[in-house]
Amino acid sequence: MVALEVALRNNPTKGHIAKSLKELNYDFVFIDTPPSLNSLTLDALISSDGTLIPLQCEYYSLEGITSLVNTINELTNSGLTNNKIFGIIRTMVDKRNNLTKDVSDDLEKYFPKLLFNTLIPRNVKLAEAPSFGLAGTNYMPESCGAKAY
C-alpha cells in the first residue's frame, strides 16, 4: 500500500484521463493499458468506473492478476475510485496444451465470480492485425479470434 501511495503522489499525469473523459459524450470508453502498474495505468484505473481484465492463460499472468485485483481493491477502499472489476476474460487460449487447463483451473478456483465463460483462442490473424494498423476484428473479421471477440 505504501508503494501505491508513493506512486500516486508522484504521478504527474494523475487526473488527466478523468478530465479528458468528462469532455466526451459516450456511454462506454475502453482504455487499453499496458500490463504493468505504471502511472498511466494507475490513472486509468482511478478514472474508470469498471475494469475488464484480459488474461493470457500463462502462469506469469496469474501472478499479475492477483496484484492487479489487489491494487484496484486498494484504490477503491481508499476512496480514490469507484472502479468495479467487471470480470476476467481468458485470451490467447490454446486448448491443445495443459497449461491453458491448469491456468483456467486456478482462475476458477481463485476468481470464480469474476471469470467469464468466453475463451478467446490464440489466433495468428489477431497477432498480425497491429502490423497493418488495424484491430483484429477489422483486419480479419471472419477469423476465429475476431469472432470470439
Q: What is the role of each PLM region?
A:
Residues 10-14, 58-61, 142:
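Flexible, glycine- and charge-enriched loops at secondary-structure boundaries
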Residues 22-24, 28-124:
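Conserved catalytic-core segment of NTP-binding enzymes
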Residues 128-148:
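C-terminal boundary of histidine-terminating zinc-finger modules
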Residues 2-9, 98, 137-141:
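Acidic, proline/glycine-rich intrinsically disordered inter-domain spacer in sigma factors
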Residues 1-27, 129-132:
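P-loop/Walker-type NTP enzyme "switch/lid" segment
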Residues 16, 67, 148:
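Charged catalytic carboxylate motif
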Residues 13, 17, 103, 115-116, ...:
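Hydrophobic side chains within well-formed alpha-helices
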